[in-house]
Structures are given as C-alpha cells and as structure tokens.
Amino acid sequence: MPPRSIEEWFYYKLLSSPGFHRFVRKVYRKVNGIKEDPFTDQSTAFQYLYKPTPRQKFKALRLLFWDEMRSTFGFRRRLGDRFKKD
C-alpha cells in the first residue's frame, strides 16, 4: 500500500535507513551509560561493492538511450548481445 502523504513516506524512509538506526543506538548507549561495543558497528561488504562514478553512470545511460533510439527507428540493437536473455 502506498503512503498516504509525504510525511508518511518520509517516516517509512527514515525507519528503513541504517544510518538512523546507528544514530538511535549511539544515543541509547550514551543515555544509559553503556560502553560502545567495537563489534556492533563492523563494516559490511557494502563498502567494498562496486560504486560507479557519475561519469560512468552518464556513459551507461547514454549508451542505453541511443540503443533504445536505434531500436525505436527499426535499426538493430548494438547492446543486445551484451545482456543475457533467460
């Protein structure tokens, strides 16, 4: 079910963000005098995943756009052989 208002959408986005949960966890520890556990904020594999630069994203968008334009006007796709069709 979609959110009924923009406030509800922001609420769902906030509750689903890991950064918000890290912040709440830190505040909770400080308020209750709990020492910070070094293993709770371990780095995840997300840090090591491939992150394309804005230039790479633009280049990919440009390639896909022109390939789509070619197919729209009846020409053969150039990128069709680069993707698996299962």
From Swiss-Prot:
GO cellular component, one term: mitochondrion
Free-text function comment from the UniProt entry: Component of MIOREX complexes, large expressome-like assemblies of ribosomes with factors involved in all the steps of post-transcriptional gene expression.
Keyword Mitochondrion: yes
Official protein name in the record: MIOREX complex component 7
Keyword check for DNA damage: no
One Pfam family it belongs to: Mrx7
Summary of subunit composition and partner proteins: Associates with the mitochondrial ribosome.
Main location: mitochondrion
InterPro entries in the cross-refs: Mrx7
Location(s) in or outside the cell: Mitochondrion
Signal peptide from the UniProt entry: none
UniProt entry keywords in alphabetical sequence: Mitochondrion
